[in-house]
């Protein structure tokens, strides 16, 4: 059998655009197809799937082949508990160098005092942040007050009292329905709600925007140890100067989760009071989403927290993932480029044009529009659920995700809205003209969904159906867009058949 690599090289002979990265990618697939066919085939299927859908899930993006290749190597075999140059294992010199470079690059990119690049995910980064705050602000002073140097010197009774004090600390953060994340403390099924006493703040029911006066009132009432700011489904920017003042007025630590908009900070779109770095005590983020890196987490902080973050292991982590840290380094270096800054600005320009087009068609968006990379469509006037819209749009090649509204009568599973974002489409090179085309396709699909009642066991459930003519038209328009803006154009899918 002629290998994928051989076919690729034959087809690429004499053509411009062939790269070492694409050659390496095909070589890896060749090996997997021979050694573990089921895995190799699934990777190819996923590539085909991503190349046949408009990826509009706001939390997703496309990483470069360089980022992906940095993950696929023997760095995964190295244990490196500890921090650079202070490991619990020997022979970590190369991993030390990589992690040190990653830390320094993160500090340069975000103009931060210190950085921890070890968290495996955004949820891990958030957990590390809250543990660092409790350790530094509660445990440290308590240990010193008792005349000890370390927590290990406490008696069992003293340690029990310390744990009770830590768990009694108050956290004030955005509710899930108002755009917060499940790790912001207000979802009882999540571990964060079990670490502290958590209280939510919500968007204003009329403006659907966060009300700083109300947040200030709640902060004065609850006196939180931690004030959380950030979002996963909120389409406006935040004023971190105001939030910092609220935190200072009630003696709170300001923790910002910028997982969704880190790339917009790195790219110079969010500046001054919209940039959390000069104002927050601790900032967490993922390294994918708008940063276009590997799946992973990152914590940035003021110098005050540096020694605590350097003890991420054993605070809440064991061994970091050095192969992913290598990929994070690549992505962060890519984000330092002029091209990335242009990309970040285009993401927001595209989102605004997309929102304007939806509004011109008469759809309702939460907050009335967007100032960042995403928006949430209220489907109430169309009489369909977010789950139905998500499924039907997926069937014509458009990937979105259902999203609950601040006052959602349907519930968190089916929801009354869908969330859309522009990071991935912008990575493909699409601009404002394409956003208008995409909006037109989506609106036509949504407005032509018909509901039919189906019996499932003892219950009745609505199911969405789309006339085949409308569905085929949408598929054709999506296909034409993706042919003009292919994912990884240097990789010929014909060679993968």
From Swiss-Prot:
Reaction(s) this enzyme catalyzes, per UniProt: (6R)-5,10-methylene-5,6,7,8-tetrahydrofolate + glycine + H2O = (6S)-5,6,7,8-tetrahydrofolate + L-serine
NCBIfam families: PRK13580.1
Alphabetized CDD domains for the sequence: SHMT (cd00378)
Name listed for the protein in its UniProt record: Serine hydroxymethyltransferase
GO MF, one example: glycine hydroxymethyltransferase activity
Compartment annotation: Cytoplasm
Pathway assignment: One-carbon metabolism; tetrahydrofolate interconversion; Amino-acid biosynthesis; glycine biosynthesis; glycine from L-serine: step 1/1
Oligomer and partners: Homodimer.
Job description of the protein: Catalyzes the reversible interconversion of serine and glycine with tetrahydrofolate (THF) serving as the one-carbon carrier. This reaction serves as the major source of one-carbon groups required for the biosynthesis of purines, thymidylate, methionine, and other important biomolecules. Also exhibits THF-independent aldolase activity toward beta-hydroxyamino acids, producing glycine and aldehydes, via a retro-aldol mechanism.
Annotated keywords: Amino-acid biosynthesis, Cytoplasm, One-carbon metabolism, Pyridoxal phosphate, Transferase
Residues of the site described as Plays an important role in substrate specificity: 288
Residues with N6-(pyridoxal phosphate)lysine modification: 289
SS bond partners: none
Essential cofactor(s): pyridoxal 5'-phosphate
GO biological processes: glycine biosynthetic process from serine; tetrahydrofolate interconversion
Keyword ATP-binding: no
Superkingdom assignment: Bacteria
EC numbers for this chain: 2.1.2.1
Family under the similarity heading: Belongs to the SHMT family.
HAMAP family the UniProt entry points to: SHMT
GO cellular component: cytosol
Binding positions ((6S)-5,6,7,8-tetrahydrofolate): 176, 180-182, 306
Main EC class the enzyme belongs to: transferase
């Amino acid at each position: 059998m002629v290998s994928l690599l051989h076919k690729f090289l034959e087809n690429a002979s004499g053509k411009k655009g062939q790269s070492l990265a694409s050659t390496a990618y095909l070589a890896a697939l060749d090996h997997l197809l021979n050694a573990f066919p089921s895995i190799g085939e699934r990777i190819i299927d996923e590539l085909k799937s991503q190349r046949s859908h408009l990826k509009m899930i706001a939390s997703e993006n496309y990483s470069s082949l360089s980022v992906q290749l940095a993950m696929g190597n023997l760095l995964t075999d190295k244990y490196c508990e500890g921090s650079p140059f202070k490991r619990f294992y020997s022979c970590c010199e190369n991993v030390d160098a990589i992690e040190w470079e990653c830390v320094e690059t993160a500090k340069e990119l975000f103009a931060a005092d210190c950085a921890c690049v070890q968290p495996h995910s955004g949820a891990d980064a958030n957990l590390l942040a809250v543990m660092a705050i409790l350790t530094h602000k509660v445990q440290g002073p308590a240990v010193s007050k008792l005349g000890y140097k370390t927590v290990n010197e406490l008696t069992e009774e003293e340690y029990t009292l310390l744990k009770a004090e830590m768990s009694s600390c108050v956290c004030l953060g955005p509710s899930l329905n108002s755009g917060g994340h499940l790790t912001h403390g207000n979802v009882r099924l999540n571990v964060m709600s079990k670490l502290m006493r958590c209280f939510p703040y919500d968007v204003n029911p009329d403006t659907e925007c966060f009300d700083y006066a109300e947040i200030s009132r709640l902060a004065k009432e609850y006196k939180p140890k931690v004030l959380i700011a950030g979002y996963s489904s909120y389409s406006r920017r935040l004023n971190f100067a105001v939030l910092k003042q609220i935190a200072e007025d009630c003696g709170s630590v300001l923790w910002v989760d910028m997982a969704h908009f880190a790339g917009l900070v790195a790219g110079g779109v969010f500046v001054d009071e919209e940039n959390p770095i000069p104002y927050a005590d601790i900032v967490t983020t993922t390294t994918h989403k708008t940063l276009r890196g590997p799946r992973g987490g990152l914590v940035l902080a003021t110098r005050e927290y540096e020694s605590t973050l350097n003890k991420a292991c054993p605070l809440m982590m064991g061994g970091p993932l050095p192969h992913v840290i290598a990929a994070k380094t690549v992505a962060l270096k890519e984000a330092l480029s002029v091209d990335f800054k242009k990309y970040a600005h285009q993401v927001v320009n595209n989102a605004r044009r997309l929102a304007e087009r939806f509004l011109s068609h008469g759809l309702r968006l939460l907050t009335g529009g967007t100032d960042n990379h995403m928006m949430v469509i209220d489907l109430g006037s169309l009489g369909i659920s977010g789950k139905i819209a998500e499924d039907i749009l997926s069937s014509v090649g458009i990937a979105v995700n259902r999203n609950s509204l601040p006052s959602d009568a349907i519930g968190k599973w089916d929801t009354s809205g869908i969330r859309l974002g522009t990071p991935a489409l912008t990575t493909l090179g699409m601009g404002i003209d394409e956003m208008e085309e995409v909006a037109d396709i989506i609106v036509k699909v949504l407005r032509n969904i018909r509901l039919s009642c189906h019996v499932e066991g003892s219950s009745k459930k609505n199911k969405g159906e789309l006339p085949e003519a409308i569905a085929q038209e949408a598929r054709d328009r999506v296909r034409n867009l993706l042919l003009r803006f292919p994912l990884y154009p240097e990789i010929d899918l014909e060679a993968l058949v």
